[in-house]
Every structure is written in C-alpha cells, then in structure tokens.
Amino acid sequence: RNWGVPIPSYTCADCGEKVMNDATLDAVIKLFHEKGSDAWFTDAPESYLGESCVCPKCGGHHLKADKDILDVWWDSGVSWKAVCEYRPELEYPADVYLEGSDQHRGWFQSSLLTSVGANGHAPYKAVVSQGFTLDGQGRKMSKSLGNVIDPNKVCDEMGADIIRLWVASVDTSSDVSIDHEILARTSDAYRRFRNTLRFLLSELEGQFEPETDGVAFVDLLPLDKLMVARLTQVQAEVDDAYASYEFPRAYRALYDFVVTELSNVYLDALKDRLYCDKPGSLERRSAQTVLAELFSMLMRDLQPILSYTVDEAMAYAPAGCVDHQKYAALLDWYKSPITVDEANEFEGVLEASLELRSAVTKALEDARSAGTFTCLLYTSPSPRDA
C-alpha cells in the first residue's frame, strides 16, 4: 500500500535486521510534525534520522523505510484521540457514534478497543447502528434490477421532509425497505402533520398571543385540562424516545397522538368554541391556550424530523409559541405547564371521558343507521349581534 499511516520501522539493507527504537521514533515524530506522514514515502531515511540512521546489529548505515501501514481500522479507531481530544469544541467521550451495521466489527470495535486500552472506558456514550436500504421486496438495490430509489429525485418530487419522515418512521437498526408505494404512505402521514399545524395556526395567527392572552392551567376548562395532561404524557414518551435514539418510537407517539387524539377527538370537539364563541371569552381563550401549547410542543418535537416544514410554520407562529426565535433548531425542548405526575392524576378522568365519548358516538351512529336520528339547529341572534 502506498498510502495510509506507516508503521515506522526500517530494514537494514546490509543484514536484513528490523530497526525501530526510541531514537528513530523521535526522528519520525519530528518529520511528521514538519511534513506530514506522506514524508515517510518520499524522504530518504538518512535525510531525517541523522545519527540514529544505524543498524544496531551490524553497524550499517543503509536503512530502508518499510512500506507496511497500520490497519485502516486502527486509523479510524483512534479518531477519538486525533479528533475529539485535540479539538476544544468537541467532547470525549463523544455523545454518539453513528455508522452502518457492517461497522460492528470495524470502526465501533477498533474505537472501543483502543479507547479502553488507553483510558479504560469507551470513546462514546452511545452507539447507533443502521442497516442497509432495500427495495420494497427486500432486494438489494441495483441498476440491473431497475429498483434504485434516487433520494435526490425524491427530494425534487416530494420534498426532503418526506425522506426525513420515512427515515424516522422505520427501524434503521436493521435493513429497511423503500419503494414508491412506501413513500406514498409516508407522504400521507406527512400531510396529516402538516394539516394539523395549519389548523393550529389558523386559530392562533393574528388572534392569540400566549404571553398576553393565555389562561393559567388552573383556570382552563375541564376538557382543555385533560388535553394538557395528555400532551404532557405524550411529551414524556417522545423525550424518552429521542434520548434513547429510538426515532421510530418518537414518530409513532407523535403520529398516533396527532391522528387519533387531536384530529379525531379534541380538535373536532373545540370547533364550536373556536367558531362560535366570542373572541376574548374565557371559553375561546382556554381552547386557544391549549392550541398554543400543542403548537409549541409539535414545533419542537417535529423539528429533528420535519425541519423544513417546521421552519415554514415558524414564520406564521405567535412569538410566544416559539420563544421569539426565527428558526426551530434554536428552540429549547418543550416543557409542559404541569409535571408528568400531575398529568397522571387525570388518567382516570381521561379514560372515563373517552369511554363515554365512544359510547355516545356508537349510539349516534346506530341511530343514524336506523334512521331515527334527527338533529335540529336553531339560531336566534340578539338585535345587537344582528
């Protein structure tokens, strides 16, 4: 090999003895500091070894630099030393090492062995290993099969956030499949997140500022208190998932919350208050206070996944929802107005409320199917309102 980090040993041209000692090593260190490791292959040993250019066995002065190099896994395996320890803006151990599953016996292992051998501990706090990308049928992608998915083309057609959302939704610790059908399903999930953000903004932008219009938790309407309790529980799940690098779990918690609990239940139940109650009334401000909390939560939780979408939403957000920041990446993690323990105290009421809603909804559906359900709506505006 004519590249790589050389093993700094020499061979005596006169007797074949291998030569490597403190004097030669000091000379090589000085050479590398001045010219870099490539000088090993370009400079004659006698030009930098000086008096140490001598064979201890036969006394000859004709030393030839050996061409062997260190294993490339040794090179990368000491990056914690060459990079993390020497650069003041970095930390050692590193927060996380991220690589493919083929590095279990490569970089991950060589880094672990060298760091433990030198310092007695791992060079990383966590390891995140990813599998390989296969087509929808689980086959390796190849041009001959015509099953290659070009991420640049997907970005052009669907947007980068679709790829980011797909990556977050699958278990990348093992091999994952992708094709146009899978991306279409991902695109549908993306629209659900985006539409939820749009709805929240439609009830907040230019109408509500949490810092001046917000309602304290103790004064919220009962339904709104239940939603704050629920979002607090979901946030705890998302925090734990992100801390464990379990991105699919974070995605699933957010997706289920948005689709099942927000769109299908809570946001639907708020529409009477949001559309009919007087602006500035407690009933409406109570609802908007929770919408602002939901928006603040989703901005922060979705930022690692839907970076571009969240930045787009930031442009229309009330300043108090986004800490007066311009970019979502600068936001701190979401903090609920109540603790998880306080939220858990509402668990029984929340379950009973959902069971009651389910029973009422079923009764209404049965009555509608039987043709016995009638709904009459009367409006009677006062002269002042008219």
Annotate each PLM feature.
Residues 1-205, 227-270, 290-300:
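Structured secondary-structure scaffolds
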Residues 63, 207-236, 267-363, 370-371, ...:
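Acidic, turn-prone loop/beta-hairpin segments
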Residues 381-385:
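A short, hydrophobic C-terminal helix/tail in secreted or cell-surface proteins
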